């Protein structure tokens, strides 16, 4: 229905952003809302309009490739929008594709809501079909090697990051296991989320 929406970010929350376009605020659910910043500068968000009998929602992504992976994940039995967002929010796109190609169920079950059955279904449905979502232009927006110019964060940023992790489906016990590492840092909300997801996916759960 919509290819993309352009506008400025009026609100950023744990689950979604509000993009103002010509005076209309679009609620757009994204993998990691905190990669966006409130600003009067116009941006473009690639969108996917999800419609079911009990829900109608707009999902947004920074690239077409990210959106394409989202739609492919939705095609897997057992994965809904929330699960697909959690996988994308990890920022480990290359690792996800590699795990599918290598039939690595142990890596895939680390994501919220993905059990062994769903992991096997992901491999069955997507193996050999993801080359078009990881071209050279598809950069890892969540790389630990990024260099940030923003000022360091505070406990407010950490609180926001924890809320975002809960919104993605991570349990309190999982969050609490990585919290000591996060408390050692002074980061922005986006950086806290990336750090936490990196720890969660590398076995510290």
UniProtKB/Swiss-Prot annotation:
GO molecular function: ATP binding; four-way junction DNA binding; four-way junction helicase activity
Annotated segments matching region Flexible linker: 142-152
Stored InterPro entries: DNA_helicase_Holl-junc_RuvA_I (IPR013849), Hlx-hairpin-Hlx_DNA-bd_motif (IPR003583), NA-bd_OB-fold (IPR012340), RuvA (IPR000085), RuvA_2-like (IPR010994), RuvA_C (IPR011114), RuvA_C_sf (IPR036267)
Pfam family membership, one: RuvA_N
Biological process terms in GO annotation: DNA recombination; DNA repair
Annotated spans, Domain II: 63-141
Residue ranges of the region described as Domain III: 153-205
CDD domains the UniProt entry points to: UBA_RuvA_C
Annotated Gene Ontology cellular component terms: cytoplasm; Holliday junction helicase complex; Holliday junction resolvase complex
Sorted UniProt keywords: Cytoplasm, DNA damage, DNA recombination, DNA repair, DNA-binding
Region annotation (Domain I) ranges: 1-62
Subcellular location: Cytoplasm
Comment on protein domains: Has three domains with a flexible linker between the domains II and III and assumes an 'L' shape. Domain III is highly mobile and contacts RuvB.
Subunit structure as annotated in this protein's UniProt entry: Homotetramer. Forms an RuvA(8)-RuvB(12)-Holliday junction (HJ) complex. HJ DNA is sandwiched between 2 RuvA tetramers; dsDNA enters through RuvA and exits via RuvB. An RuvB hexamer assembles on each DNA strand where it exits the tetramer. Each RuvB hexamer is contacted by two RuvA subunits (via domain III) on 2 adjacent RuvB subunits; this complex drives branch migration. In the full resolvosome a probable DNA-RuvA(4)-RuvB(12)-RuvC(2) complex forms which resolves the HJ.
Annotated family: Belongs to the RuvA family.
Function: The RuvA-RuvB-RuvC complex processes Holliday junction (HJ) DNA during genetic recombination and DNA repair, while the RuvA-RuvB complex plays an important role in the rescue of blocked DNA replication forks via replication fork reversal (RFR). RuvA specifically binds to HJ cruciform DNA, conferring on it an open structure. The RuvB hexamer acts as an ATP-dependent pump, pulling dsDNA into and through the RuvAB complex. HJ branch migration allows RuvC to scan DNA until it finds its consensus sequence, where it cleaves and resolves the cruciform DNA.
UniProt name for this protein: Holliday junction branch migration complex subunit RuvA
The species this protein was found in: Bacillus cytotoxicus (strain DSM 22905 / CIP 110041 / 391-98 / NVH 391-98)
Upper taxonomic lineage: Bacteria, Bacillati, Bacillota, Bacilli, Bacillales
């Amino acid at each position: 229905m919509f290819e993309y929406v352009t506008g400025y970010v009026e609100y950023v929350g744990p689950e979604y952003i509000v993009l103002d376009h010509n005076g209309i605020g679009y609620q757009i659910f994204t993998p990691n809302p905190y990669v966006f910043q409130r600003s009067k500068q116009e941006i473009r968000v690639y969108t996917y309009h999800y419609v079911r009998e009990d829900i109608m929602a707009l999902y947004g992504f920074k690239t077409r490739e990210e959106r394409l992976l989202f739609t492919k994940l939705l095609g897997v039995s057992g994965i809904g929008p929330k699960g697909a967002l959690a996988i994308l929010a990890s920022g480990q796109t290359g690792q996800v594709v590699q795990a599918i190609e290598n039939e690595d169920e142990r890596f895939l079950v680390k994501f919220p809501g993905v059990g062994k059955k769903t992991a096997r279904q992901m491999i069955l449905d997507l193996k050999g079909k993801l080359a078009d979502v990881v071209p050279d232009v598809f950069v890892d927006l969540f790389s630990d090697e990024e260099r940030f110019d923003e000022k360091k964060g505070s406990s407010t940023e950490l609180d926001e990051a924890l809320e975002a992790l809960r919104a993605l489906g991570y349990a309190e016990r999982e969050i609490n296991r990585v919290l000591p590492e996060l408390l050692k840092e002074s980061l922005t909300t986006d950086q806290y989320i990336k750090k936490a997801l990196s720890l969660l996916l590398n076995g510290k759960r």
